[in-house]
């Protein structure tokens, strides 16, 4: 509500969304407004904790934490004032995306610093000095990948294919994934750039980077890139497809969620599968706008002939020595037939008869429409059933097909390159996990794990290893973050409960818990806000909120 010239104006916020409904990931670690030493420290620790919690156990090591901490100390002060703090927020979103993709610390650190380099706030020499030659090499390669499409006309499919193949065969796959995460962020922030640049960027994404994401196995990322570029390049076509899909999307997604839960329970309760399968992973998906457009336009299908709008993948963790997994997949199909209406004409057994590229999976379809003439009609749901081993092989095999790498020999060679690069990435920076207790006692290991965030951050700040954070160490940190000695003194007074002029691990742990509580409260606030927004929007659609606003406005004006 605002007042203009004595007149009360009741603001009715717009509810229409224009951007594609792309997949939403967990939010990036929060920023805290710059200012006092306490806020700067809270910002650094909050971001550090958020990223390390996202990293997989196989890459979360002491050397990884040290590298990530250095990257944050370098990037936070450099980006905090850039574009009103938006550059820093975007850098952390990219870092969170990379952590969610289970990239190692070198990739995540390079992702943080790349944004600072693109903003002109950090030089390559500084990045290499702080992060080492490995991360610096990733930064250089990611810049090469970024510039590769600008050297050719990507509208020409042959030229675009050559660029894709050159990138896959010539660069570290981690540098490719780094650039993909940065491209996704850029696609979400194109509104402020000229229209011609929006189109050029979107075309590069559609022809080069989205297929690359498929080729390296990052299917969810590729789907977002496709939908965003489709929306920018073909807005009218996008609107048509969006109108068709969105009309049934909410209902279909609810059905998917229910089916997933019901199927997991049924599979876990099956006697035969209990003996042959150690676990189940069920994933559901609703067809993306771009993928639907390709089926309708490129393949010439009618809407009723698009049979995979709803999709589910069932991955079986097949027990060793229990056969080749084919029988377990067949049994899973039998369980599904007992739950839903099977469509036999849509069954394709690529396990018994693998595709030419070796792809193995059992494809079936089920009719999810409600029974009876008055029942709700829904599209068929395609279900893919495979073992974990079949899925691991399919990730790269199908990815290469989706990436438009048509030459089988070239595809095999590039597949080998990607697998080898992934192995290198998995081994990079790997050392013994720093648990703080190497006795091997389970209880001690569990306690160390639960206190991991506090312990590792404290060790990084306690540079001389004496078990306390001195005034000198705290001042050095504040200076690294762009603050000064007065901020360090203020922070010491705030945290030093026993007034001995240093911070013990217990005093530091108390501060960490305050930081974590603040983040949890803010997350819960966001969750409640979204729930209320959805509920009030439904009420708004009935006109009740408009009546309330008018009555409120009348009272305010008359008063």
From Swiss-Prot:
Expressed in shoots. Pfam families: EF-hand_7 (PF13499), HD_4 (PF13328), RelA_SpoT (PF04607). Gene3D superfamilies: Beta Polymerase, domain 2, EF-hand, Hypothetical protein af1432. GO terms for biological process: guanosine tetraphosphate metabolic process. Signal peptide: none annotated. Residues 1-37 form a transit peptide. Ca(2+) 2 binds at residues 496, 498, 500, 502, 507. It comes from the Eukaryota. One of its GO terms (molecular function) is calcium ion binding. Residues 449-484, 486-518 form the EF-hand domain. It catalyses: GTP + ATP = guanosine 3'-diphosphate 5'-triphosphate + AMP. InterPro entries: EF-hand-dom_pair, EF_Hand_1_Ca_BS, EF_hand_dom, HD_domain, NT_sf, RelA_SpoT. Ca(2+) 1 binds at residues 462, 464, 466, 468, 473. Activated by calcium. Its EC number is 2.7.6.5. Keywords: ATP-binding, Calcium, Chloroplast, GTP-binding, Kinase, Metal-binding, Nucleotide-binding, Plastid, Repeat, Stress response, Transferase, Transit peptide. Residues 87-187 form the HD domain. Belongs to the RelA/SpoT family. Possesses calcium-dependent ppGpp (guanosine 3'-diphosphate 5'-diphosphate) synthetase activity in vitro and is able to functionally complement E.coli relA mutants. May be involved in a rapid plant ppGpp-mediated response to pathogens and other stresses. This is GTP diphosphokinase CRSH2, chloroplastic. The lineage of its organism: Eukaryota, Viridiplantae, Streptophyta, Embryophyta, Tracheophyta.
């Amino acid at each position: 509500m605002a007042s203009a010239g004595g007149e009360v104006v009741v603001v009715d916020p717009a509810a229409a969304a224009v951007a594609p409904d792309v997949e939403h990931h967990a939010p990036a670690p929060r920023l805290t407004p710059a200012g006092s030493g306490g806020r700067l420290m809270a910002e650094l620790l909050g971001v550090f904790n958020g990223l390390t919690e996202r990293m997989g156990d196989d890459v979360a090591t002491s050397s990884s934490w040290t590298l990530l901490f250095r990257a944050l100390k370098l990037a936070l002060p450099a980006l905090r004032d850039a574009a009103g703090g938006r550059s820093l927020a975007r850098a952390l979103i990219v870092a969170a995306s990379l952590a969610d993709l289970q990239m190692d610390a070198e990739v995540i650190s390079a992702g943080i610093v790349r944004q600072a380099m693109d903003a002109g706030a950090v030089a390559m020499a500084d990045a290499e000095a702080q992060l080492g030659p490995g991360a610096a090499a990733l930064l250089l390669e990611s810049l090469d990948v970024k510039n590769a499409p600008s050297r050719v006309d990507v509208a020409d499919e042959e030229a675009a294919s050559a660029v894709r193949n050159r990138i896959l065969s010539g660069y570290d796959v981690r540098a490719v994934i780094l650039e993909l995460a940065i491209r996704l962020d850029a696609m979400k922030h194109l509104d402020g750039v000229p229209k011609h640049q929006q189109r050029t960027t979107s075309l590069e994404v559609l022809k080069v980077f989205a297929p690359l994401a498929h080729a390296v196995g990052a299917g969810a990322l590729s789907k977002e890139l496709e939908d965003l570029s489709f929306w920018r390049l073909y807005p009218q076509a996008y609107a048509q497809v969006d109108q068709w899909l969105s009309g049934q999307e909410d209902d279909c997604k609810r059905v998917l969620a229910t089916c997933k839960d019901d199927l997991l329970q049924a599979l876990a309760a099956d006697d035969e599968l209990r003996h042959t399968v150690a676990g189940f992973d069920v994933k559901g998906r609703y067809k993306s706008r771009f993928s639907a457009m390709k089926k309708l336009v490129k393949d010439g299908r009618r809407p009723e002939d698009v049979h995979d709008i709803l999709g589910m993948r069932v991955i079986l963790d097949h027990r060793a020595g229990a056969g080749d997994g084919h029988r377990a997949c067949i049994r899973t199909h039998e369980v599904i037939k007992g739950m839903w209406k099977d469509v036999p004409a849509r069954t394709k057994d690529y396990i018994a008869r693998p595709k030419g590229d070796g792809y193995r999976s059992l494809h079936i379809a089920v009719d999810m429409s409600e029974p009876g003439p008055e029942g709700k009609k829904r599209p068929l749901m395609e279900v893919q059933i495979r073992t974990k081993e079949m899925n691991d092989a399919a990730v790269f095999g199908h990815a290469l097909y989706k990436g438009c790498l048509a030459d089988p020999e070239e595809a095999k060679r590039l597949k080998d390159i990607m697998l080898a690069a992934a192995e290198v990435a998995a081994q990079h920076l790997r050392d013994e996990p720093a648990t703080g207790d190497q006795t091997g006692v389970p209880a001690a290991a569990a306690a160390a794990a639960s206190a991991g965030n506090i312990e590792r951050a404290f060790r990084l700040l306690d540079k001389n290893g004496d078990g306390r954070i001195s005034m000198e160490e705290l001042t050095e940190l504040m200076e690294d973050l762009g603050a000064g000695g007065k901020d360090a003194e203020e922070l010491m007074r705030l945290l030093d409960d026993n007034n001995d002029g240093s911070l013990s691990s217990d005093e530091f742990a108390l501060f960490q818990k305050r930081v974590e509580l603040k983040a949890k409260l803010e997350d819960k606030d966001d969750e409640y806000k979204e729930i209320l927004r959805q509920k009030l929007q439904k009420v708004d659609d009935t006109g009740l909120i408009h009546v309330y606003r008018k009555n409120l406005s009348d009272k305010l004006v008359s008063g």
